[in-house]
Design a protein with these regions (language model features):
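Bacterial N-terminal signal peptides that target proteins for export
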Residues: 2-14
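Signal peptide processing junction and immediate N-terminal pro/mature segment
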Residues: 22-35
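Central antiparallel beta-sheet cores of small beta-barrel/beta-sandwich binding domains
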Residues: 33-34, 51-133
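N-terminal helix-cap/turn-to-beta initiation motif at the start of protein domains
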Residues: 33-47
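Edge beta-strand at a domain terminus
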Residues: 141-143, 149-165
Length: 165
């Protein structure tokens, strides 16, 4: 959140300078994605992540993880080879029922807990089920370990997402 606040404050003076990564963006091109890109480094879960199909090893989607008020959320940004054009979360219930998968929030409520993020929830759009979850960076920040579970973490399932370049 500090990065977003700093960048928003600096936007009002005419340019954005992200000193940590040496990025300059003109005010006309300033977007929240610039803040995400600047924050995407080996110590941060923020940024774009490739989700990998366990069975085929192929990339299924890109999920963008953002932070607001210290809480991480993740939204599907792009789908690769969807089974139907413009797929929706037809198995979801409640407010997410039949929402388009692109733009759907699938991670929410994750808080920093040392070198990981815990206390969040994970939506599996293929089943419509919601799980408790934890996130942790691996391989020098190149991979994100997502562990979803019901009840106790021991009985869950883990996926590894790869940072998108």
């Amino acid at each position: 959140m500090k990065l977003f606040c700093t960048i928003r404050a600096m936007t009002t003076v005419g340019s954005i300078a992200a000193v940590a990564v040496g990025v300059f963006v003109s005010p006309a091109r300033a977007r929240p994605q610039a803040a995400i890109a600047a924050a995407s480094n080996s110590a941060s879960a923020l940024g774009r992540w490739k989700t990998i199909d366990d069975a085929t090893g192929k990339v299924k989607s890109i999920v963008e993880i953002t932070e607001q008020d210290g809480v991480l959320t993740g939204t599907i940004e792009q789908l690769f080879d969807p089974p139907v054009p413009h797929p929706t979360c037809y198995l979801c219930t409640g407010a997410k029922k039949d929402l388009p998968l692109v733009g759907l929030q699938v991670l929410w409520g994750f808080h920093a807990d040392g070198n990981s993020w815990t206390g969040g929830m994970v939506l599996d759009p293929e089943t419509g089920k919601i799980y408790r979850g934890s996130l942790a960076l691996e391989d020098g920040g190149k991979q994100l370990r997502l562990h979803g579970y019901i009840g106790i973490p021991l009985l869950g399932r883990t996926e590894h997402w790869v940072r998108a370049e």
